[in-house]
Amino acid sequence: MRGAGPSPRQSPRTLRPDPGPAMSFFRRKVKGKEQEKTSDVKSIKASISVHSPQKSTKNHALLEAAGPSHVAINAISANMDSFSSSRTATLKKQPSHMEAAHFGDLGRSCLDYQTQETKSSLSKTLEQVLHDTIVLPYFIQFMELRRMEHLVKFWLEAESFHSTTWSRIRAHSLNTVKQSSLAEPVSPSKKHETTASFLTDSLDKRLEDSGSAQLFMTHSEGIDLNNRTNSTQNHLLLSQECDSAHSLRLEMARAGTHQVSMETQESSSTLTVASRNSPASPLKELSGKLMKSIEQDAVNTFTKYISPDAAKPIPITEAMRNDIIARICGEDGQVDPNCFVLAQSIVFSAMEQEHFSEFLRSHHFCKYQIEVLTSGTVYLADILFCESALFYFSEYMEKEDAVNILQFWLAADNFQSQLAAKKGQYDGQEAQNDAMILYDKYFSLQATHPLGFDDVVRLEIESNICREGGPLPNCFTTPLRQAWTTMEKVFLPGFLSSNLYYKYLNDLIHSVRGDEFLGGNVSLTAPGSVGPPDESHPGSSDSSASQSSVKKASIKILKNFDEAIIVDAASLDPESLYQRTYAGKMTFGRVSDLGQFIRESEPEPDVRKSKGSMFSQAMKKWVQGNTDEAQEELAWKIAKMIVSDIMQQAQYDQPLEKSTKL
């Protein structure tokens, strides 16, 4: 799917010809390998250091323009790799104030406690869902059930078009500069021709993968260019000026195609001679292909989602549609990369307001949460920034007598977040009073809930709170780091193997089962409500059978998963009290004034078990004595006598109370 991002298993060599949306992922992948140095030219081109923006820009330009000197590229890359490695080692060096002796009983601080850890994988925003390849398929499935999947797909394709278009425009600009430099009267170089042909082949391969290679046809296929251009223009309802611009650009493309095909033949035409003698010709053809791919992608997106005769058009106005047409067919003949940005914002708002809240409550999101919780890589941030998971974690911390650590972290983090949100525009005295509440509770020598911080941390907090102008938003950073590290290293592993964690999983699984049963019934009955009740469809039985089999298979998978984690439902589910094996059958009855349950309907005679003959019953009574029923009956008689005696005494004392009141 376009827009979902490149696959994590793609190698850097396959991503190298494309300088567009894969570059950000490529930089992340190369970050862990910045220490390695190879002699391969392609590997050195791909190894872009994330610590040096100048190096990243330069290598990006080299990838697009393909400079002639590979030796210079090797030298520059090696030097900047060594510089980045030394700078990274300096940054990773632990400062003097972060030594182990600085921290108290809560353990050593976590140096990775940064802003990126304030996000939980279990609670997502719509923007995070659209950029996360794990939860995005669940959201698409949810939208497919609502027949609104075209909104998600349009947003993804428009986002991909926006990023790739800017990268292609940058490549076009670099090739234009390179073409102007090569246009000077210099003797042709074989090295230039090899480099340009390599870039042309690489671009052709990338455009074939993205579905845009249909514009770059051979001479035999170039006959249908005018027909396809006319159909595209009619479908887009473009103006006459736009038609002329399209035809002009396509004629240029056909001329470039003729030029490429004729270069392979042994002819003496003027076009062939000019192509062989000018090293700028392949770069000019490359730039033309880049701009053609932008135009074709814009046309495809418009045809699928914005055109009036699209299968599932997005909800936009006619004025917005005309604006998009004007941006695609600009006066200068270029496509605006931001032509779909406004439509993206409309679609994003529609998904957020009408569908996303329901998705968070659906079993699709529960399935995603189960996948995260069972992946084996659950972090503390996933628990602390998710309300449902934080509830179970707080119960676990309370059982471990460490809930004060969690409460301090929540209170201090909330305090710092509120101060940071005000951006310095807050009352210093009020902030100091709030900070003193936390200090008196957790840090002072007379603290009500001491956490074990040492004197160094306590003095640091005192100086941060009592500063002139009030405390800063980072006044509790050091104890927050210690509390975070303690919960992460000491309590999180125990929580992930506790019964409360399995109860959390069990609740999610039960919610998925219930929603699947309800959703399955609705999906099976909804198609039948469209037509008359007596109308039968030949394929309805097959579809219902397939849907029921799929539902049973999914439930079986969840059942096996439930058994695999070994959840003791008797100790976790309160409803199990009503499912005891030794509990008697439920019967109708009433409770008397004395608290005795009196049955209103006795079981049928044949249901009662045979107690044997009269002789056997007499022998049992003689051997065992009175039965339980007889003893219970005698106890009720005694209770009635006691209650009646008390009632008589109360009625006897009642006239005296009335006389005293009078």
From Swiss-Prot:
Transmembrane segments: none
Presequence extent in this chain: 1-28
RGS domain ranges (all copies): 125-369, 379-505
Record's compositionally biased regions (Basic and acidic residues): 32-43
One Gene Ontology term, aspect cellular component: plasma membrane
Region (Disordered): 1-55, 261-282, 524-548
Bias kind Polar residues: ranges: 261-280
Any one of the GO BP annotations: protein localization
Compartments it resides in: Mitochondrion; Membrane; Cytoplasm
Coiled coil spans: none
UniProt main location, coarse: mitochondrion
Keyword terms, alphabetized: Cytoplasm, Membrane, Mitochondrion, Phosphoprotein, Repeat, Transit peptide
Record-linked InterPro entries: AKAP10_AKB_dom (IPR037719), Cell_Polariz_PKAAnc (IPR052246), RGS (IPR016137), RGS_sf (IPR036305), RGS_subdomain_2 (IPR044926)
Spans annotated as PKA-RII subunit binding: 634-647
Domain notes: RII-alpha binding site, predicted to form an amphipathic helix, could participate in protein-protein interactions with a complementary surface on the R-subunit dimer.
Identification of the protein by name: A-kinase anchor protein 10, mitochondrial
Species assigned in the record: Homo sapiens (Human)
Primary gene name: AKAP10
